[in-house]
Amino acid sequence: MSKPIDMALFLSGVLTGSKATQQRHLRQARIMQAAIQQRWQRDNPWTWQLKHLRWFLTQHLKDNTDATRYYYRLTALLLWKRLGRVRELLM
């Protein structure tokens, strides 16, 4: 079994904002990574598809507040930006 990808290194090129914001994005990205790994056995964001992030945002977070879901959406957009797939979200 391979070692999970280091999210801090993975997101280092797209993380902006204050230190607290960066830490929140990293924490949330690791939570997303763990949930997607548990559901689909994909711990590497390079193998993720849009359906994985949509599942996380709609199903995994369905019992969370709107504010929580909003902040996770921001983190998901950062992940998608890092993957170079932003155009897929627009279509």
Residue ranges, per PLM feature:
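Short terminal alpha-helical segments
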Residues: 1-21
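Non-catalytic DNA-binding core/recognition domains of DNA-processing enzymes
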Residues: 15-88
